């Protein structure tokens, strides 16, 4: 074949090859552009979701709860032990929506603090060896089901700056009770959490309350002794934190332990021996969570309080009748630490002093003397 005949064929093949390369390049470019658009849309969705939930909480809880005030040593009802009170408690305190395919945000913590909540429950995970707050509906240490997380350092900073300030909390001198449920076995994360707590030494309880208060029941201490302080409670469902001595210095109490129980609401509602639970809660404490699920209803505070349970953890983003009743209960009490009724508090059994003996009835040796004799009988 002549050279002149080959050139058109070669040119055609070259053109086809170039077209294929251009087509592949366009496909790759289009795919990259599609991914970028998806990422931008995802970021916009998350931003709008966070903004929507924060706006919702702000609309409901934007102002300070004027019905709640700080405990005071001038009120005799504030002079009892910690376990003799109901605590106003928020469940998953950084959550403003459901626990799956949703977001967490620090704005939700600020909102519940404005309402006077002093019991704060968190679910803590490990990301890049750092403790973070998120939520999930599965009992798995490797899965969080929220799109984002909140660093625990931001949680502590918010507690320091908002929980103890009169402009952001109506009861700013009341103690804060932090309850943590760990979803990790990462010891490096636990060490980093200990380092974080160390930077808040002045806010936390002293060394006499380290290592679970050295086996003593912190609930048996006077409520007023914890004013302006943070009490740390870890849940023993995951005991990995017990291996970290540095962190144990900051653990004042544990739930699912001898001094404190943890229940889902179902287990309180269907408890076969409520009288035993009432007796237990007279000297110890219990925390009650909503039942499992991505968007559960709140516990019935009336039933849980009747069982003597001190911390009935509420979902403040779920405005149902149970939340409204719980809010009304603490508003009427005017404290976030509301004294339990007398029949649900421990009263030690005392034995009255013995009647003094009549010396005339004594069997001791005595002397009998007359003008005629003297002898001992």
Regions found by a protein language model. Give the residues of each.
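Long, acidic (Asp/Glu-rich), low-complexity accessory segments flanking structured domains
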Residues: 2-119, 126-205, 209-377
């Amino acid at each position: 074949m002549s050279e002149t005949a080959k050139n058109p064929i070669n040119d055609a093949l070259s053109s086809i090859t170039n077209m294929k390369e251009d087509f592949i390049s366009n496909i790759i470019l289009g795919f990259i552009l599609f991914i970028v658009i998806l990422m931008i849309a995802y970021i916009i969705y998350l931003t709008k979701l966070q903004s929507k939930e924060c706006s919702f909480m702000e609309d409901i809880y934007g102002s300070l709860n004027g019905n709640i005030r700080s405990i005071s040593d001038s009120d005799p009802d504030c002079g009892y032990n910690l376990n003799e009170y109901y605590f106003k408690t928020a469940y998953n305190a950084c959550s403003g929506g459901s626990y799956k395919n949703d977001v967490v945000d620090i704005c939700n913590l600020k909102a519940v603090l404005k309402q006077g909540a002093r019991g704060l429950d968190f679910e803590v995970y490990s990301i890049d060896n750092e403790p973070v707050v998120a939520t999930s509906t599965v009992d798995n240490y490797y899965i969080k089901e929220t799109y984002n997380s909140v660093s625990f350092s931001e949680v502590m900073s918010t507690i320091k700056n908002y929980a103890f300030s009169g402009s952001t909390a109506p009861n700013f001198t009341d103690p804060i009770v932090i309850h943590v449920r760990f979803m990790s076995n990462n010891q490096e994360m636990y060490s980093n959490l200990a380092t974080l707590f160390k930077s808040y030494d002045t806010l936390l309880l002293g060394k006499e309350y380290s290592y679970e208060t050295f086996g003593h029941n912190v609930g048996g201490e006077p409520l007023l002794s914890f004013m302006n302080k943070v009490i740390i409670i870890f849940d023993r469902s995951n005991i990995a934190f017990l291996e970290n001595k540095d962190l144990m210095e900051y653990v004042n109490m544990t739930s699912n332990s001898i001094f404190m129980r943890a229940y889902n609401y179902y287990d309180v509602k269907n408890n076969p021996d409520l009288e035993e639970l009432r007796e237990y809660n007279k000297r110890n404490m219990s925390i009650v969570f909503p039942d499992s699920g991505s968007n559960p209803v709140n516990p019935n505070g009336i039933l849980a309080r009747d069982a003597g349970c001190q911390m009935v953890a509420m979902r403040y983003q779920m405005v149902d009748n149970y939340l409204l009743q719980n809010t009304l209960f603490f508003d009427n009490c005017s404290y976030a630490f509301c004294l339990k009724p007398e029949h649900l508090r421990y009263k030690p059994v005392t034995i009255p002093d013995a009647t003094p003996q009549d010396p005339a009835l004594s069997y001791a040796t005595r002397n009998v003397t007359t003008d005629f004799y003297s002898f001992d009988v």
